[in-house]
Amino acid sequence: MKKYLALALIAPLLVSCSSSNKKGAEYNEAWVKDTNGFDILMGQFAHNIENIWGYNEVLLAGPKDYVKYTDQYQTRSHINFDEGTITVETIAGTDPRGRLRQAIVKTLLMGDDPNSIDLYSDVDDIQISKEPFLYGQVVDNTGASIRWEWRAARFADYLLQTRLKSRNNGLRVVYSITINLVPNHLDKRAHKYLGMVRQASRKYGVDESLILAIMQTESSFNPYAVSHADAMGLMQVVQHSAGRDVFRSQGKSGLPSRSYLFDPANNIDTGTAYLAMLNNVYLAGIDNPTSRRYAVITAYNGGAGSVLRVFSSDKVQAANIINSMAPGDVYQTLTTRHPSAESRRYLYKVNTAQKSYRRK
C-alpha cells in the first residue's frame, strides 16, 4: 500500500464523510508533512551510508530486505528474503574477521521482535534469542539447524575459513560472507504466522489464503519489513491511511503507533481488517465475489478509488460496469488498464500466490 493511498481512502467518491473540507485538508497536510519528513530522514540516512561505503554501496532495509548496520556503520548484515540469502559484510580496517564473526552469530540468533532492533542506526541492539527468527531457515555445514550460540559460532568460524571473500569498491576493501537459506525458507516463515492468520481470518471473514498471499507479496513474511512510504510490518500497513481507517472503524482515536504495527499479531489483524473494509464497505457494490476479490487485491496496493476510476469516474457507474463484466474480463482490465504499473503487477502476484496457498 503506497503513501498516496491515504488520499484515495478519504475521497468522497468512496464513502460519505461527515467531517468538513477544512478537516480533510488539515488531515492531508499533516499526512504529507509526516511523509515528507520521513523521506528526508531516509535521504539523510542513505547519504551517510554513501559517505562511508561508497557511491554504489548504499544498502537500506526494505519490505523484503533486512539490513542492519553496526560498528559505526562499517559492518552490516543483509537478509534478502526473496533470494533466500544472508550476506554479512564489513569495511572495517581492523579485525574484519572478528567483526564478521560477531555479526554472523548475532544475525543467525536474533529474535523476531522488530521493536527491539533499530534498523536506522548503528546501535548494536541485536539480542541473542532462545528462539531465533532464522531457526529452521538456515542450517550449518553439518546440516543442523542453528539455535545455540556455540553452534552459530562454530559455523561462523567454518564460513570464515571456507567462504570469506573480498573486493575493492574503489574506496574500501569489502570483506563478505554469504549464506544460503534452506530452499523452503518462505514456507518456514509463513508457518510461524499461521495461527495469527487463522485468528484474523475468523475475526474478519477474510480467506486465509488471501491474507497469506498479501503477506508473501508485501514482505515475503519479513516481520522487520519497512518501506520508503513508511509502510510497516508483514502486511505493510501505513499508519496514516489503512491504519487510521481501521482504528476509526473500531472506535479508536488517532492511528496505530509504529510499535503497534511492528507487532506481528497487530499487523496481521490491522491488515486483515483493512481487507475486510475494502470488501465490505469501499467495494461492496461489486456483486460477483471473484470480481470483488480482484478489486480488493488491487485496492490494497493502490486504493479503492483508483480501482473504480479504471471503469468510471462515478463510483456507482463503475460498480455497474464491473457487475456487467465476467470476472476474467475484470481481471484483464485491472492488469492492463490500471494507471499504476505496480498495481497491475500486484494483482497478478497476489492472485498467483493465493492459488498456491489454496492448494496447500
Curated annotation (Swiss-Prot):
Q: Please, which domain of life does this record's source organism belong to?
A: Bacteria
Q: Which GO terms describe its molecular function?
A: hydrolase activity, acting on glycosyl bonds; peptidoglycan lytic transglycosylase activity
| InterPro entries in UniProt | Lysozyme-like_dom_sf, Murein_transglycosylaseC, Murein_transglycosylaseC_N, Transglyc_AS, Transglycosylase_SLT_dom_1
Catalyzed reactions per annotation = Exolytic cleavage of the (1->4)-beta-glycosidic linkage between N-acetylmuramic acid (MurNAc) and N-acetylglucosamine (GlcNAc) residues in peptidoglycan, from either the reducing or the non-reducing ends of the peptidoglycan chains, with concomitant formation of a 1,6-anhydrobond in the MurNAc residue
Q: Which GO terms describe its biological process?
A: cell wall macromolecule catabolic process; cell wall organization; peptidoglycan metabolic process
Q: Entry's Pfam families?
A: Mltc_N, SLT
Subcellular location field: Cell outer membrane
What's the EC number here? 4.2.2.n1
| Lipid-conjugated positions (S-diacylglycerol cysteine) | 17
- Choose one Gene Ontology CC annotation of this protein and give it: cell outer membrane
Lipid anchor positions (N-palmitoyl cysteine): 17
Function field? Murein-degrading enzyme. May play a role in recycling of muropeptides during cell elongation and/or cell division.
State the family it belongs to: Belongs to the transglycosylase Slt family.
Protein name from the UniProt record: Membrane-bound lytic murein transglycosylase C
Gene for this chain: mltC
